[in-house]
């Protein structure tokens, strides 16, 4: 039950945060971006926990790719299949289907550098997760 509450809270924070970033950046958002943001924040939290011993830069790289894949999926569903025209990156260099492009992947990387420590802070504050920057070295069995 605690996990459901944690996921619900993280989804809500991510959804509101993602929509907020979009409103600041584009002065508008769409309900699908709240859903995408919630999913992305859950994924980022999972990446943060699984890659706990890795550098923040590596975690941010993986996170940026994950967010980009979520954007691609949502773009295909909402922009291409349902023709809702939520966004269109067709004019951006090296775009794929007008749904994703390297510039926004780079921006997600930069944002992830802040979002990942924020997720760690929330994990510690709200859920009592101990956060180590690096994994403890394994102790040798031979002494």
Cite the ranges covered by each PLM segment.
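Aromatic-rich, lipid-facing transmembrane alpha helices and their immediate juxtamembrane interface loops
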Residues: 1-143
């Amino acid at each position: 039950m605690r996990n459901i509450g944690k996921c619900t809270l993280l989804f809500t924070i991510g959804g509101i945060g993602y929509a907020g970033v979009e409103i600041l950046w584009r002065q508008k958002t769409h309900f699908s971006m709240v859903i995408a943001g919630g999913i992305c924040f859950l994924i980022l939290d999972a990446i943060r926990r699984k890659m706990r011993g890795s550098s923040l830069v590596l975690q941010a790289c993986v996170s940026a790719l994950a967010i980009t894949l979520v954007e691609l999926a949502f773009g295909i569903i909402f922009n291409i299949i349902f023709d809702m025209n939520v966004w269109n990156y067709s004019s951006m260099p090296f775009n794929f289907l007008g749904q994703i492009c390297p510039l926004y992947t780079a921006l997600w990387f930069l944002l992830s550098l802040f979002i990942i420590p924020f997720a760690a802070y929330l994990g510690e504050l709200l859920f009592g997760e101990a956060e180590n920057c690096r994994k403890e070295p394994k102790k040798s069995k031979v002494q």
